[in-house]
Amino acid sequence: MRLPAGRHIRSIDAPIVPQSGRADTLDTLANRRLAGPDQEIPISSFADKTFTAPAQIRNFCIIAHIDHGKSTLADRMLQLTGVVDERSMRAQYLDRMDIERERGITIKAQNVRLPWQVSGGEDAGKEFVLHLIDTPGHVDFTYEVSRALEACEGAVLLVDAAQGIEAQTLANLYLALDRDLTIIPVLNKIDLPAADPDRYAGELAHIIGCEPDDVLWVSGKTGEGVARLLDEVVRQVPPPQGQADAPLRAMIFDSVYDIYRGVVTYVRVVDGKITPRERIAMMSTGATHELLEVGIVSPEPKASDGLGVGEVGYLITGVKDVRQSKVGDTVTSARHGAQEALTGYREPKPMVYSGLYPVDGSDYPDLRDALDRLRLNDAALTYEPETSVALGCGFRCGFLGLLHMEITRERLEREFDLDLISTSPNVVYRVIKEDGTEIVVTNPSDWPEGKVRTVYEPVVKTTIIAPSEFIGTIMELCQSRRGELGGMDYLSPERVELRYTMPLGEIIFDFFDSLKSRTRGYASLDYEEAGEQEAQLVKVDILLQGEAVDAFSAIVHKDAAFAYGNKMTTKLKELIPRQQFEVPVQAAIGSKIIARENIRAIRKDVLSKCYGGDITRKRKLLEKQKEGKKRMKTIGRVDVPQEAFVAALSADAAGDKSKK
């Protein structure tokens, strides 16, 4: 690991400007820095020319915990380098999806090519091309971050000067260290009244192993210190290495689907060069394509003459099949191509599974096409067809976490205009039956009948960082979720890091919400897979009129089975409309009933037409009704409306939350 050295960065290179004057100040600064005395336009045009010498290129990304200001800092960099004019500028410029902008989070990593002219030091006045990749911060999108890091030589580690180091800060730091990237530590949001940069600079320096004076101070909101940061990127991040005269090798680090142009593939060129109209080959599949367009993103796509060593850009081949462009694959020339592929990415393993079903069964082909397209944009998504007795045809989908699941469903509904039902999320279990055969269960309906010998569930190593005053309540919560304490460290007298090993099934519902509520929102959580462990798990079936409804079945720990059964039977009693006959709602483990509620019958008034007369006439009508209800109860079916499914399944986690 290469640590920051050289000049101490404590003084700030620009005064803080008030909110109202921020845009003009940045615009003036950008024009002053990027326009020479004889130029009428900013020299951003030099970055539009490709085949830049590798010594003039710097590839870096911004990594941080969620909501520490990555996208806002990227906005200031876009303004400062002049690639976005004032009229086009908007907050979170690189966050292209509506969901990202509404929630204020980054989901997809975005790359952009920036021009920069260094203002001081031995490189003063020299022009450089910076490739910036803005990455997500949430634990569910760690795979996006790891792919972005593969395309870089350096990383800006951003920490909120008012909140300090959090769990995902450490997780992203370790990802960058694994790839031997240059780390530039930066404190953001120094303009906040609650900011304490001196304290958190010490924390950051302690973790990285540098001096507190080596930590840069910036404000993504006002633009303060951003120019100095870009100078430091040029000075500290090494240029890309590669052989210009070697056969072409380029790594696919992302791809998107464009409805008009087909698959758009984002690559980082490692060796050789790539030009339009040449034929390329994918080394994993051997498929060949003709390049229709090669270009750069600055920050809008711009066609170019090609890409050279170390450059990042996009390729368009006109291919419509989303499976032809696999993230992690190596692109080479169809003629005289490279013999050895680049090291690809580790395939992400889904940690949470859920069923997605169209409300209208005729939308099933549309759902399949939508998942195919989304799979190209989201390499971590997996899915396979499945059928449910209650919900019809759908897909069993694998996700990296609950937020990933929620975002995927929302994108399917918005971008492809689908109405969907999602079943309760659950994890992957390994079940050993009595006869020694082994099956993998991702769906409660796959759980074997009869006795099982052993069950293994996935476990994760969790890292929780919180104020030390909340240690007691955090430990109580983790122990109630079958967690085992692995260690505890004080980052400072006020902040503590707790490490637990916990079953993944215990944290995928409402663990994070419970953690936040117990710590007044101050705790942060990160987790990574840590193998599996033996567990006492059972399948709880929900029976309506004696028939199991597969959509409501769940795999839970033996100690929690009774609570789950009670919760679901009570909820369904409220949600399912009353019938002409009494309907028992039961929860069962195998043949043993553990909870029961009755949905009372609707009483039809058969005596309404009798205005008097003989009591035997009334008794005859009542006996006839009684016989009819008895017959209906034996042959009648209970139809559960779609609204009840949606309410029961979506409120599953919320029900847990309210009871704690």
UniProtKB/Swiss-Prot annotation:
GO terms for cellular component: plasma membrane. It is found in: Cell membrane. Residues 55-241 form the tr-type G domain. It catalyses: GTP + H2O = GDP + phosphate + H(+). SUPFAM superfamilies: EF-G C-terminal domain-like (SSF54980), P-loop containing nucleoside triphosphate hydrolases (SSF52540), Translation proteins (SSF50447). It is a peripheral membrane protein. SMART domains: EFG_C. GO terms for molecular function: GTP binding; GTPase activity; ribosome binding; translation elongation factor activity. Its EC number is 3.6.5.n1. Pfam families: EFG_C, GTP_EFTU, GTP_EFTU_D2, LepA_C. One of its GO terms (biological process) is positive regulation of translation. Keywords: Cell membrane, GTP-binding, Hydrolase, Membrane, Nucleotide-binding, Protein biosynthesis. Required for accurate and efficient protein synthesis under certain stress conditions. May act as a fidelity factor of the translation reaction, by catalyzing a one-codon backward translocation of tRNAs on improperly translocated ribosomes. Back-translocation proceeds from a post-translocation (POST) complex to a pre-translocation (PRE) complex, thus giving elongation factor G a second chance to translocate the tRNAs correctly. Binds to ribosomes in a GTP-dependent manner. This is Elongation factor 4. It comes from Mycolicibacterium paratuberculosis (strain ATCC BAA-968 / K-10).
